[in-house]
UniProtKB/Swiss-Prot annotation:
Gene source species: Natronomonas pharaonis (strain ATCC 35678 / DSM 2160 / CIP 103997 / JCM 8858 / NBRC 14720 / NCIMB 2260 / Gabara)
GO biological process: cytoplasmic translation
Record function comment: Binds 16S rRNA, required for the assembly of 30S particles.
RNA-binding found in the keyword field: yes
Protein name listed in UniProt: Small ribosomal subunit protein uS14B
Highest taxon in the source lineage: Archaea
Keyword Ribonucleoprotein: yes
Record InterPro entries: Ribosomal_uS14 (IPR001209), Ribosomal_uS14_arc (IPR023676), RIbosomal_uS14_euk_arc (IPR039744), Ribosomal_uS14_sf (IPR043140)
GO molecular function, one term: zinc ion binding
Length: 49
């Protein structure tokens, strides 16, 4: 790790809003849960009852 390398906290932020909390990182999605709920259907995820 060099002096310019981002920390884990800086590296993992929501790609849509820039938030650091409530991230969905599975499959390298990196969206906060609110953004994921809005975009999940467009990304091909299906909601099951």
């Amino acid at each position: 790790m060099g002096a310019q390398d981002p920390t884990d906290e800086d590296r993992h932020v929501c790609r849509d809003t820039g938030r650091k909390q409530g991230l969905v990182g599975k499959y390298d999605i990196w969206l906060c849960r609110q953004s994921f709920r809005e975009m999940a259907r467009d990304m091909g995820f299906k909601k099951y009852d």
